[in-house]
């Protein structure tokens, strides 16, 4: 059976932080303006947290917003490349890195 997780890093991270603070999924769903089933899918990696929700999560969990945003962005890269051949994934990442470096 194929793994249903599209976003593999961010969901488990926010789940771990929620459990560490003893919060319920319902509470987080409310904070983010969504429902519990959708929030559950976010934690499972089946749905992506919206960019504007990341700062809210960082504030709630009292974690560095840049660190959480970096993880969120990396998750997007993972989702875009996850089904590609390994060498193609790595080449694409290297090329993107070169492009970003040339822009600075």
Predicted features along the sequence, with ranges:
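Residue-level detection of the helix-turn-helix DNA-binding "recognition helix"
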Residues: 19, 33, 44-46, 55, ...
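Short, charged recognition helix plus adjacent turn
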Residues: 69-104
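Residues within the helices of the helix-turn-helix
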Residues: 15, 26, 55
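Short alpha-helical DNA-recognition segment
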Residues: 22-41, 60
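Residue-level signal for the short linker/turn that defines the boundary of a DNA-recognition helix
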Residues: 12, 22-23, 49-52
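DNA major-groove recognition helix of helix-turn-helix/homeodomain DNA-binding modules
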Residues: 33, 50-67
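A short, Lys/Arg-rich alpha-helix, primarily the initiator
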Residues: 1-20
């Amino acid at each position: 059976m194929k793994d249903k997780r599209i976003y593999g890093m961010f969901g488990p991270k926010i789940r771990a932080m929620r459990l560490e603070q003893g919060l319920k999924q319902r509470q987080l769903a409310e904070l983010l303006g969504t429902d519990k089933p959708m929030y559950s899918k976010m934690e499972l990696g089946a749905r992506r947290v919206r960019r504007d929700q990341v700062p809210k999560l960082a504030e709630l969990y009292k974690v560095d917003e840049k660190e959480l945003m970096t993880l969120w962005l990396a998750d997007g890269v993972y989702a875009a490349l996850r089904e590609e051949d390994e060498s193609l994934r790595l080449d694409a990442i290297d090329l993107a890195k070169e492009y970003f470096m040339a822009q600075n």
